[in-house]
Amino acid sequence: MDHNDHVNLLRPANLNQGGVYADLGAGNGAFTLALRELVGLDATIYAVDRDRSSLNELDAVHRARFNTSRNLIPLNKDFSHPLDIPLLDGVVMANSLHFFKDKEKILRHVHGFLKPNSALIIIEYNVDSGNMWVPHPLTFETYCALAPRAGFSEPRLLARVPSRFLKEFYSAVAFTM
């Protein structure tokens, strides 16, 4: 996938300009950069990841692409633990949910980061069995059953992109209730 694919997986969510967002499991920021393109430079984005070097790379790329790191807040943290962040207008979880076996528990935890009627966008492999690199993926159909149990609306499929590894990626949005 390239930057255009990342943007196109997020774009159909129609996120508002400005606001406060988080990319949970941001890594080197592929989806953080796509999110920035869609919500603008006035939005605050928390890029949360356990890997400090990936966050440093993201900060450098963000500065190069947008001529600033203003409103980008890298957090070298594990998002499955409490975070000292304000309530969010939206969360992106791109290829981070599949590392958790108990997805409902993680989604309930993430729900606590969000304001009412806020968006959770996930990007995942559209398969239910994984491998050592993608241990616990979930299909869109599985996510549709899971999200309401964690306090979210019925998810809406946003886009699909082919994958060389595990069939395809999908993006979906669900809202806090």
Predicted features along the sequence, with ranges:
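Conserved beta-strand signature within the Rossmann-like core of class I S-adenosyl-L-methionine
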Residues: 117-125
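Short alpha-helix
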Residues: 136-151
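A short acidic, Gly/Pro-enriched loop at the edge of an enzyme's catalytic core
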Residues: 80-91
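A short SAM/SAH-binding and catalytic strip from SAM-dependent methyltransferases
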Residues: 89-103
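Core SAM-dependent methyltransferase catalytic element
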Residues: 161-177
